[in-house]
């Protein structure tokens, strides 16, 4: 019987690549997120099942599955959004993470959780190189919210014995990326008739 994985935020750049990877490893893949996906789009990114919904205990339980692995890619992915809409950013990032953790604690304590975090947690660091023990000083609401989510993951791991790995991903690029410096540069070059200077 195939192992089962739940990917929150599976339609996004990171989530869709995670889904494709685990599908290629033979997992039965389940995804949840805010946007709609057609059956064809789901299959293109390696999803067997897609649910358009908020990330909540209730919505995860509606899959009626016990997952071996959960990769929580859901939440806000924009520093700019967090500055313009800090409350909404908090709900997406922190509340969504808490829903996943509570689902695991109460309903699926044997699952392994992978939480992709961000270097925004570390913020600006005067000392180089940055060491793993550096507590960080986030420079944006996005960074603070990711830090709170990391702290929740660490707390649930220590207090309830949940198996959680936090991975801070730096400068992730690849097919399907539609934001960040590389994307912006390529679009400017593609759409410009003049010389592009950065």
Regions found by a protein language model. Give the residues of each.
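NAD(P)-dependent short-chain dehydrogenase/reductase
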Residues: 127-128, 151-198
């Amino acid at each position: 019987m195939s192992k089962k994985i739940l990917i929150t935020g599976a339609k996004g750049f990171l989530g869709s690549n995670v889904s494709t990877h685990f599908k290629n490893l033979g997992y039965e893949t389940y995804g949840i997120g805010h946007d709609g996906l057609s059956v064809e789009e789901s299959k293109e990114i390696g999803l067997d099942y897609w649910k358009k919904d908020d990330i909540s205990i209730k919505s995860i339980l509606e899959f009626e599955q016990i997952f071996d692995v959960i990769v929580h890619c859901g939440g806000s992915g924009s520093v700019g959004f967090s500055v313009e809409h800090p409350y909404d950013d908090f709900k997406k990032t922190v509340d969504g993470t808490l829903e996943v953790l509570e689902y695991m604690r109460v309903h699926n304590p044997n699952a392994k959780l992978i939480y992709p975090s961000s270097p925004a947690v570390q913020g600006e660091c005067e000392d180089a190189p940055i060491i793993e023990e550096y507590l960080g000083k986030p420079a944006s609401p996005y960074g603070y919210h990711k830090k709170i989510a990391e702290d929740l993951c660490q707390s649930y791991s220590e207090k309830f014995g949940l198996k959680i790995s936090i991975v801070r991903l730096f400068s992730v690029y690849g097919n399907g990326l539609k934001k960040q410096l590389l994307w912006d540069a390529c679009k400017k070059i593609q759409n410009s008739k003049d010389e592009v200077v950065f």
